[in-house]
């Protein structure tokens, strides 16, 4: 299950941002998860809930925004947002498409609480 290594890297990134901003804890983690990222949202949530128990993210809520697949057709220049995992242009049925969005997982926003003086 590669979700564990992904969550480990995500929590490390959160910790770096918290340290840079002198935060005592992180209360919310917002990510964008592409449908073609190869990451299963429910497994990612379970892995996050497991890994967050120790450290600065232990009180954090993980919010996952699913990003649909967005393609650009190289033949008809049509840009399409697709709900299915296909790379076929719905306008002209061409396979000559380029993925614009929906393949990645991105950390979008953190909600942090500052250290008390």
UniProtKB/Swiss-Prot annotation:
Name used for this protein in its record: Hydrogenase maturation factor HypA
Gene: hypA
Keywords: Metal-binding, Nickel, Zinc
GO biological process: protein maturation; protein modification process
InterPro entries from the UniProt entry: HypA/HybF
Family: Belongs to the HypA/HybF family.
GO molecular function, a single term: nickel cation binding
Organism per entry: Shewanella baltica (strain OS155 / ATCC BAA-1091)
Domain of life assignment: Bacteria
Positions that bind Zn(2+): 73, 76, 89, 92
Main function: Involved in the maturation of [NiFe] hydrogenases. Required for nickel insertion into the metal center of the hydrogenase.
Protein residues bound to Ni(2+): 2
């Amino acid at each position: 299950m590669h979700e564990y290594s992904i969550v480990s890297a995500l929590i490390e990134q959160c910790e770096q941002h918290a340290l840079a901003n002198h935060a005592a804890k992180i209360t919310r983690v917002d990510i964008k998860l592409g449908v073609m990222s190869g990451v299963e949202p429910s497994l990612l949530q379970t892995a996050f809930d497991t890994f967050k128990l120790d450290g600065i993210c232990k009180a954090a809520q993980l919010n996952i925004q699913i990003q649909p697949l967005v393609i650009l057709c190289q033949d008809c220049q049509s840009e399409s947002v697709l709900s299915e995992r296909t790379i076929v242009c719905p306008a002209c049925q061409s396979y000559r498409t380029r993925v614009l969005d929906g393949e990645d997982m991105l950390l979008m926003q953190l909600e942090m609480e500052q250290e008390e003086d």
